[in-house]
Amino acid sequence: MLGDAHFLVTCPIDLFSEVRVTLHHGGPGVEAPADCPKSAAALTATLAHLGRADLGARLSVRSAIPRSKGMGSSSADVAATIAAAGLALGTKLLPDLVARIAASVEPTDGIMFPGIALMDHREGRILEALGPPPPMEIIALDFGGTVDTVEFNSVDRRSVWRSIGTEVDRALELVKDGLRRGDPGTIGEGATISARASQRVSPKPRMPAVLEFAGAAGAVGVNVGHSGTIIGVLLDAGARQGEAVLQQARQAFPDAKAIHRFRLTGGGLQQLR
């Protein structure tokens, strides 16, 4: 926590959610995929905010982001839905408004902000824009399990967060410094401190093994989602070791449910033609 504010640092990767919103005058109501109730709620909230609750809407969502892993899948869907609804009404909504509407539906990742963002995910406000990331890759290890982010964030963990405040402050300082200097090593150092500290909030049994693997593989660090089940091994993309470490991870963790290779990107919303 920063004072009394909850926060996270975004970690955008090269997986995306694509949303299409079609408006009609056939009466209010939203038609949406059954597995996207948060996006449907976000669409309803956006139309109400823009004074067009009288309109009906159809929503389609296509996403490659793994679900219920704390990887921001619903945040990406929701943010894209809000932006698409605005565009359907001829309005390009600013990221700050997208974030506020998103947070009215559920605690939200800051994926709508460009670059890397320090985000109050409960209030839907950016605390600081941290700039673009240097070239980095992530080998993401999924050992199974799912997380309900709404349920996770409904639990009062302030005492636990405060107990690790010193480590979290140091981790944030290092990540911010690494981003300023474009230094993957410093970013990785900060992320690792945060990941170790988060074991007291959301323990991951395989964390010790992944830390050992990351050190042996020459990674710059490890990271975890704020409320997720995935452990990421952070790599300096300039070292060109992504494919080799991916294969090493598959050999080292044959029990993993899935192992992915991602590229760290900047956040933000894009309009597709």
Q: Model segments located where?
A:
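ATP-binding N-lobe of GHMP and related small-molecule kinases
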Residues: M1-K69, G267, R273
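ATP-dependent small-molecule kinase catalytic core of the GHMP/sugar-kinase superfamily
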Residues: L94-V220, D236-R273
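Acyl-group transfer acyltransferase/transacylase scaffold of fatty acid/polyketide systems
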Residues: G221-A237
